[in-house]
C-alpha cells in the first residue's frame, strides 16, 4: 500500500493495531454499490466493525441486514402477488422474523435464484449459531468473514449496479446504464430500481453542477411510439456520436 493510501486507511480505522486491521480489511470483499442506498451504508458499517475487531458485531450485523432485506422485498411487493398461493402466508405480517418463510417467499416469487437462496440458507445457519446459545467454542473470525461474504453476495445478486445485473443494460451505450425493457413490469424492479432511475429519451443530456452533481436534462419531444432496447441503443449511439 502506498504511503498516502496507508495514511487514509489509518485515518479511517485508527493507528492502534493497524497491521491487524489492515489484514482483516484485505481479507473481505468490499461493499457493493446497491440501488438501495442504505444497503451500501450498512455494509460499510459491518465492514468497519470487522476491521476494528468487532467480530460479533460484524456477524450479527450481516445477519440483521439479511433479515431486513427479505422483509423490505416481501412487504413492498406482496400486493403484486395477491393471486399467488404463498401470499396467504405473508399478507398479515408487519414484519417477518421467520427466515424459512422469508426465503421460501422470495424463491416462490422468483425474486432470488438457486444460488442466492443457498447464500441465504447459509446465512440463516450462521444467524442461528450466533444468536442462539451454543454450548461450544466458536471461532468468530471465520464466521464473521463468511457472514460478510454471504451478505455482500446477496446484495450483489439482488441490487448491485454492475455488468452482472440482468436487469441493467450495462454500457451497451458507452458509459451509460439503462433498465432493460423486459423487466419494467417486474414488481421487484418497480419497487427497488425505479426510485433510482429516470425516464429519458435518446436525446437526453447530462450536465455537471459546480458541486460535482450530475443533472439529467431531457426537454425533447419524441414520437408516441414504443421502441425496443436495441433500437434505443442504436438511436442513442447515433445521437451521442454527433
Feature-to-residue mapping (PLM):
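Charge-enriched, short contiguous segments at helix-coil
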Residues: 33, 110-183, 203-217, 222
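Charged alpha-helical initiation segments
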Residues: 1-55
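Short, hydrophobic, well-ordered secondary-structure elements
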Residues: 46-47, 51-75
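Short, hydrophobic/aromatic alpha-helical segments in well-folded domains
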Residues: 42-45, 61, 126, 150
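Flexible secondary-structure boundary motifs
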Residues: 69-121, 125-129, 165-166
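Intrinsic low-complexity, glycine/proline- and repeat-rich
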Residues: 182-242
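Alpha-helix boundary/N-cap detector
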Residues: 4, 13, 34-37, 94, ...
Amino acid at each position: 500500500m502506498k504511503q498516502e493510501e496507508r495514511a487514509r486507511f489509518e485515518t479511517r480505522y485508527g493507528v492502534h493495531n493497524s497491521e491487524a486491521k489492515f489484514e482483516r480489511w484485505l481479507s473481505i470483499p468490499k461493499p457493493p454499490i446497491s440501488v438501495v442506498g442504505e444497503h451500501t451504508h450498512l455494509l460499510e458499517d459491518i465492514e468497519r466493525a470487522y476491521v476494528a475487531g468487532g467480530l460479533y458485531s460484524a456477524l450479527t450485523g450481516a445477519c440483521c441486514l439479511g433479515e431486513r432485506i427479505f422483509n423490505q422485498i416481501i412487504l413492498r411487493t406482496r400486493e403484486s402477488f395477491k393471486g399467488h398461493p404463498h401470499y396467504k402466508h405473508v399478507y398479515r405480517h408487519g414484519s417477518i422474523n421467520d427466515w424459512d418463510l422469508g426465503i421460501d417467499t422470495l424463491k416462490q416469487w422468483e425474486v432470488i435464484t438457486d444460488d442466492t437462496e443457498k447464500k441465504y440458507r447459509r446465512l440463516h445457519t450462521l444467524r442461528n449459531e450466533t444468536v442462539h446459545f451454543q454450548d461450544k467454542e466458536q471461532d468468530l473470525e471465520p464466521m464473521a468473514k463468511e457472514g460478510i461474504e454471504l451478505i455482500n453476495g446477496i446484495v450483489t445478486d439482488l441490487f448491485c449496479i454492475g455488468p452482472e445485473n440482468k436487469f441493467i443494460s450495462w454500457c451497451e451505450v458507452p458509459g451509460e446504464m439503462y433498465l432493460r425493457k423486459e423487466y419494467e413490469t417486474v414488481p421487484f424492479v418497480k419497487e427497488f430500481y425505479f426510485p433510482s432511475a429516470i425516464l429519458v429519451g435518446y436525446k437526453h443530456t447530462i450536465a455537471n453542477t459546480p458541486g460535482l452533481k450530475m443533472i439529467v436534462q431531457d426537454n425533447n419531444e419524441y414520437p408516441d411510439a414504443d421502441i425496443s432496447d436495441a433500437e434505443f441503443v442504436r438511436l442513442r449511439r447515433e445521437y451521442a456520436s454527433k
